Amino acid sequence: MPTACYVGTDGEKFYQYTMIEEASRERFIYAYKEASSYSTVDFVQRAIIYFGYAPEMIQTDNGGEFTHTQKTNRSHPLDILCSRLHIVHKTIRPKTPWHNGKVERSHRNDQERFYNYLKFYSYEDLQIQMKRYLRRSNRIPMSVLSWKTPIQKRQELEAARFC
């Protein structure tokens, strides 16, 4: 998560969750007051609404908000949701953040384009500004997409799917 997700006069810390659609590189981001399994489940449900479909696979690191960090017979809430929605939940190997390179790069971009330049006065203010930023960031052309924006690429992929 970006390093400067602090807001308010008390320096409250918030946590940015990020989902990237692999083919179009379109992103969905949302901030939470805690990094927990409940926030994770809520985020995945919000992302499904945002994208309009459930992904085939979700890849995460091994944080406790995504998976159990100790052996247990209990299922993690994210795994329960994924099972119910027929989503494969893949975790990267521990201590290998480069295996989540697209998300890590997007967090660096968020830091440079968003957190370094804006101040947030409350959690609500952060959410409002984050929504605006997400709209803008999904409209930035990317070299990997032949200088199309993620939104343009998604529209292109959807048009090809219905032909």
Please tell me what each predicted stretch does.
Residues 31-32, 68-73:
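Short, solvent-exposed loop/turn segments at secondary-structure boundaries
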Residues 1-28:
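An active-site-proximal beta-strand-loop segment
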Residues 85-87, 109-163:
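C-terminal domain-tail junction helix/linker
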Residues 53-70, 93-95, 147-150:
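Acidic/histidine-rich, metal-coordinating catalytic segments
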Residues 12, 29-53, 57:
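Active-site beta-loop-alpha junctions of metal-dependent nucleic acid enzymes
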Residues 61-62, 72-82, 89-112, 126, ...:
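RNase H-like two-metal-ion nuclease catalytic core shared by retroviral integrases
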Residues 2, 19, 25, 44, ...:
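Mobile genetic element proteins and their domesticated derivatives, centered on retroelements
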Residues 7, 66-68, 99:
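Short, small-residue-enriched loops and turns at beta-alpha junctions
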